[in-house]
Amino acid sequence: VSSAASDVYKRQDPSSRQHGTAHILDLCEAQWVCTLPAHHVTSGCWSTRGKQLVLGLQSGELLQLTPEGEVKAMLPPLPESERSLYVEDVQWLENHAFLVTYNTCPPTAEHNQEPVHEYEVFMIVRDPKANTMTYSAFPLDVAPPFGDTSRWPCRYACTLRDWMPMKHIVFMACSASTDVGVIGFRHAWEALELEDTSRPVLPFSSQDETSDTGPVALALDLSSTDSVPDPNAAAKGEDPSATLPAVPILYVYTNDGVLLAYHVIFTEAEAPYPGMVSIESNPAFSPSALPAPTIPQPSSTPAP
């Protein structure tokens, strides 16, 4: 939906009264709409049509509900896990398909605890007729924590849909990783390997030019109108100066204050990306300062 957004603001102090609550903010009306009936929320994502959303919980469960707070379904946590896991990130890709990243729950709730980066990435597919769930693990994490592991865990993801022959292309980054990985679905889900010269890699810190940097935001720009050079023009026997139609731009903002931009070029694409949009000259709304949402006191009644 154009008037709503999904994001998670993490607090290092779990004792905070606002810890784990979820709120709906209407961006067009510039007002808080409601507080959702969920506790210990760790992540969230809108459905593809923006009519519902799914919240990942500290218990490892997924709560599906409407923006008005009506609970539609509860998806169980990862079965037979030897560790206590919470939902670090959830991407609602199709009506019954969820890309979920789990992380190990910290052993304590102390403020000075060490960050934990023990991720597991799963594709969860729900069969509504048989009322069953299929959990399929990715053998490798495409955004492993091989960078600054002193940063608090956070997963970032954004998706391109129906860029045939790929049904889904998911870019994924981790707060403790220096790379941006890619997961795709053509005939099956798989981690996509990019050439070294084409792989998004975050630069060293501008402070000392040796320290790793990590992402703090990841987004796609679908409004570009500029053509881009075709990297395979010469290999195809075409004019080396040949260009491709405008493509999506992947933005990565780092903790060093650097904004990186990458053209997303799909060399096997059957046509330009169908999700490109045009930007109106006048914005639909102008954001204004908002008061903080009113947080109700915790109730003794368990959440639905």
Predicted feature descriptions by range:
Residues 1-5, 9-12:
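Single conserved hydrophobic/aromatic residue that forms the stacking wall/gate
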Residues 17-33, 61-74, 124-132, 184-189, ...:
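Per-blade loop-tip surfaces of WD-repeat and WD-like beta-propellers in eukaryotic adaptors/scaffolds
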Residues 17-22, 51, 59-62, 97, ...:
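Loop/turn residues immediately N-terminal
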